[in-house]
Design a protein with these regions (language model features):
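Conserved Sensor-2/SRH helix of P-loop NTPases
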Residues: 84, 162, 211
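General small-molecule cofactor/ligand-binding pocket signal
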Residues: 56-61, 201
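Serine-dependent amide/ester hydrolase catalytic core
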Residues: 19, 65, 88-195
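Structural helix-boundary/capping segments
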Residues: 1-34, 44-53, 119-149, 157, ...
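Short, hinge-like loop/turn segments at secondary-structure boundaries
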Residues: 74-78, 180-181, 219-220
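Amphipathic alpha-helical segments in well-structured domains
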Residues: 40-44, 77, 186-189, 232
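Charged, often glycine-rich, active-site loop that binds/positions anionic groups
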Residues: 69-83
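A short glycine-threonine-serine/GTX helix/turn-capping micro-motif
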Residues: 12-13, 33, 71, 106-112
Length: 242
């Protein structure tokens, strides 16, 4: 873990109560996905609301955005499998009795690790294997770097990027346990900040058809938290009007 010595703003004083003159970026590739979701009308209303109060909305392209989810999960699974290697029942976590070291590790990891953790270890080991390292992991790292550069260029020219938090409203606990791919797809917008390594915030903006929250995500450049807090405060007054 590392930290920066760069001074940060007084975030409370950053909340100005208005967004006049702010440049809000939207991503056309995200827009195409939004049009297929429950967010479509709401997203347009939020953009109109921001423009009504003096913000400038710009449309931008990230050519490789459609690759962002597999890129993220390839890297995340690899990192997870590497990290989880330490949980062998000897040095970390609980332990299960066994006749040998390998038996202890096998029993411990089989019985104490959850299904999702096991899934990530298996996929991570696959993409890090000698046969697939270059075609999966290294390719994902290269694409992540290219996607990051495209986004940072946009953030250098705008104050914020605005996009939904998920495809739809919040889902109930356990509703997607049997369909992990469906759950992963819900991350398609939030993984952006992970790939970029920049600050982001999700704010509830309305309720969906089942009465559960719909969220919008605010993304800014490195150390751009003041823009996020100001916009989040502004959107807290959004009442659904255009």
């Amino acid at each position: 873990m590392s930290s920066s010595s760069e001074p940060v703003d007084d975030y409370l004083s950053s909340i100005l109560g208005n967004i006049a003159g702010k440049k809000i970026a939207i991503i056309s590739e995200v827009q195409e996905l939004v049009e297929k979701t429950e967010h479509a009308d709401l997203f347009q209303k939020v953009l109109a609301y921001c423009q009504k109060h003096g913000a400038c909305v710009t449309t931008n392209h990230v050519e490789k955005y459609t690759s962002i989810l597999p890129v993220y999960y390839t890297i995340a699974m690899a990192e997870a499998s590497s990290t989880m290697n330490r949980f062998d029942g000897i040095r970390y976590t609980g332990t299960m009795a066994g006749e040998s070291f390998l038996d202890i590790v096998k029993r411990t990891r089989s019985n104490l690790l959850g299904r999702e953790v096991k899934r990530r270890i298996m996929i991570g080991n696959f993409v890090l294997s000698h046969e697939h390292y270059a075609s999966y992991y290294l390719k994902a790292k290269q694409l992540a770097s290219e996607i990051k550069q495209e986004f940072l260029k946009i953030l250098n020219e705008n104050d914020l990027i605005l996009m939904p938090t998920t495809y739809g409203e919040a889902f109930t606990i356990g509703s997607k346990v049997s369909d992990p791919v469906s759950m992963y797809i819900e991350d398609i917008f939030t993984v952006t900040a992970n790939i970029l390594g920049v600050p982001a915030m999700s704010v509830p903006i309305a309720k969906g058809s089942n009465g559960l929250p719909l969220g919008l995500q605010l993304i800014s450049r490195p150390f751009g938290e003041r823009e996020i807090y100001n916009m989040a405060d502004f959107l807290s007054h959004f009442g659904g009007e255009a």
